[in-house]
Amino acid sequence: MISFVIFNIFYENNKFFFGKIWTCLPINDTLKCDNATYSIILVILDNMTQKSFNQLAVKFCGFTCADDLHTATALGVDAVGLVFYPPSPRFVDVDTAKMLSLTVPAFTTIVALVVNMEQDELTNLTKQVSLDIIQFHGDETPARCQKLASAVNKRWIKAIRVKHNDTAASILNQINEFKSWGASGVILDTFSDSAYGGTGHLFDWNKIPNHSPLPIYLAGGLTPDNVGDILSNQSLMAKIKGVDVSGGIEKEKGVKCGRRMWAFMNNINNVHR
């Protein structure tokens, strides 16, 4: 494992000042070569200057180990997601989630992805794990989402799984209903009969409403290879607030790939230059 120190550089009154911001950042096995190491440092430093101009929020979801979380937060993601749905290969139990949440730096949002969770289980979860937002990703109704989120005093977002017969109008109707019950945003993901998410498949982005009363976060099939093309589409960019990716940055289910996380963020930053 390679460890190093990264310094933030400030310029004030004709002088440079160096402030240490990360110490002994681990680089996992996928980032052993010097070029990759230098690249990840450059991207982190580049994010310091690009972040204020890049208004597109980025969430990496489905973390199961601290090393992957360290890499993601160093790359400048806005939010990280932990999955509390046992059938998922990205599932983490309460003890693991508690440990992971303590490694996330300030100002990075921690999102709890739950699927049809009971209130007592959610209450226990939020008492033990430091979480910022609840992401309801199952069959929860707007009323159910509001009740559960209020019980634990958390903001919430809802995943809308887009079906083949959905239209922009039908999706907008769902968004309006979730807004009326207090949602902070919606994630548009691809519908599947066999899973509640993480399928790696795209849906028809032409179905995304033009004018949503809630922020829309795009998910479903995003990868480092296609995110640049997606974000170069100005009509699409006008509709979405951010992107949410899980499988597209993995080397196997539940295990993130440092190179793919780096490539995803690098391609986003290239679009916004």
Would you name each region that the model predicts?
Residues 1-4, 8-26:
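Cationic, amphipathic, low-complexity segments that mediate targeting or membrane/lipid association
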Residues 20, 26, 30, 34-44:
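Short, positively charged and aromatic/hydrophobic N-terminal segments
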